């Protein structure tokens, strides 16, 4: 069975290799701004499903894995920053607070579709401007929801997590492994 990961994220590719040794990459080109005013869990589930559907339409025999991760603070969705200034704004908002991280995954093959959303929380230390700018200087923030990556230098900003570390990183591998069993 051909498996396609509908993501260009190197982190997701690295994580999926722990579950599936062989797969191809086909990033989905969808509008990720649609529905951003909705509830975070609904938004992330919608994005993962749309990514899987877009690639499954092109490869109906393949098993497609679509995923999305967002950060939310008090219900406000923080996607990927559009600039260094936007990254600063996000990190300033997250400083000293606990926020939500939602990662949704959708597996689709033909008409069969299975989805799951994993909710975790992350607490940031109170951050100084110097700490924020030092992190922004690493450029890690650029392609990450909430402007940080837990697996890199962003770990230095984090006081505590509750939930699934791999989901915070971008792919809940234990959940994916269980969903894959439904397709074998």
UniProtKB/Swiss-Prot annotation:
Keywords, comma-separated and alphabetical: Cytoplasm, Hydrolase, Nucleotide metabolism
Cofactor: a divalent metal cation
UniProt keyword Hydrolase present: yes
SUPFAM superfamilies for this protein: ITPase-like
MF (Gene Ontology): dTTP diphosphatase activity; UTP diphosphatase activity
Catalyzed reaction equations: dTTP + H2O = dTMP + diphosphate + H(+); UTP + H2O = UMP + diphosphate + H(+)
Keyword Plastid recorded: no
Major localisation: cytoplasm
Top-level taxon of the source organism: Bacteria
Cell compartment(s), UniProt: Cytoplasm
A Pfam family matched in the record: Maf
InterPro entries reported for this sequence: ITPase-like_fam, Maf-like
Active site positions, chain numbering: 68 (proton acceptor)
Gene Ontology cellular-component terms listed: cytoplasm
Record-annotated site: Important for substrate specificity: 11, 69, 151
GO biological process, one term: nucleotide metabolic process
EC number(s) recorded for this UniProt protein: 3.6.1.9
Family listed: Belongs to the Maf family. YhdE subfamily.
PANTHER family: BIFUNCTIONAL DTTP/UTP PYROPHOSPHATASE/METHYLTRANSFERASE PROTEIN-RELATED, BIFUNCTIONAL DTTP_UTP PYROPHOSPHATASE_METHYLTRANSFERASE PROTEIN-RELATED
Known role: Nucleoside triphosphate pyrophosphatase that hydrolyzes dTTP and UTP. May have a dual role in cell division arrest and in preventing the incorporation of modified nucleotides into cellular nucleic acids.
Protein name as it appears in the record: dTTP/UTP pyrophosphatase
Organism: Enterococcus faecalis (strain ATCC 700802 / V583)
């Amino acid at each position: 069975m051909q498996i396609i990961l509908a993501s260009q994220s190197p982190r997701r590719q690295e994580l999926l290799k722990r579950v599936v040794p062989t797969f191809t990459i086909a990033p989905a080109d969808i509008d990720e701004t649609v529905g951003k005013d909705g509830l975070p869990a609904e938004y992330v589930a919608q994005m993962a499903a749309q990514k899987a559907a877009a690639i499954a339409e092109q490869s109906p025999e393949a098993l497609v894995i679509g995923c999305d991760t967002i950060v939310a603070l008090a219900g406000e969705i923080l996607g990927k920053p559009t600039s260094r200034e936007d990254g600063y704004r996000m990190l300033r908002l997250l400083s000293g607070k606990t926020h939500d991280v939602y990662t949704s995954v959708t597996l689709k093959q033909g008409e069969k579709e299975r989805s799951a959303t994993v909710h975790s929380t992350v607490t940031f230390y109170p951050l100084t401007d110097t700490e924020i700018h030092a992190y922004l200087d690493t450029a890690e923030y650029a392609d990450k929801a909430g402007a940080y990556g837990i697996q890199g230098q962003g770990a230095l900003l984090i006081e505590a997590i509750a939930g699934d570390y791999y989901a915070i990183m971008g792919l809940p591998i234990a959940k994916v492994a269980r969903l894959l069993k439904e397709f074998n």
